[in-house]
Amino acid sequence: MNIWKKLGGFCKDYGIWYTARKVVYRCYIKYYLGRKYCPLTISETDRRTQEQWKPDRKIKISIVVPLYNTREDFFRQMLDSVRNQTYGNWELCLADASDHEECSRMLQQLAQEAQKEDGRIRYQRLMINEGISENTNRAIEMSTGEYIALLDHDDILHPSALYDVMQAINYHQGEFIYTDELSFDGIPDRVQNIHFKPDFSPESFRSNNYICHFSVF
């Protein structure tokens, strides 16, 4: 749709003042905060520090991912981001319910190749697609870790994601950890929005499921 038609429709529905504020905010997110928060890399010094950190308990985190007709580039990016974590005691449980045979063969081949290189990766082909909730449960059934982490098949983790989660577990006895998230327009360099999650509030949670991904419990 033409951008001007979209703006006109937005003005009609919400008014000029709200529309102007929305445009300014989106530009601020995209062109300033997007550049500030987007980098998915860390310095070698930070990486060494995080990799050498020794928690009181070296807890295994099981990252569960339901796959469904996942694009190859998204799958590779997700897989690489998990393998690039500075905290290494994790396992990746992939439950594939794809109904396109060509896509499923591609995912299975990539997963098996990754398994040969990294024994922390587990893959299972599901015969029935039961929807994202039950497919996630099938991935959870594969897990052996003390904590479960929910991740989508088109998500990307920052290299420090599990390290930061472990900080919350180790120093604050966190039982349920949820994180801020960035939305991308196809590639990580194009930030669409940044979701800064609030502190836990039952009242807010009843109207807005703000925990979602990345969540660990």
Residues covered by each model-derived region:
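Short aromatic/hydrophobic "clamp" motif used to bind/position activated sugar donors
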Residues: 148
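The conserved acidic donor/metal-binding loop of glycosyltransferases
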Residues: 152-156, 180
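Conserved donor NDP-sugar-binding/catalytic core segment of glycosyltransferases
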Residues: 160-191
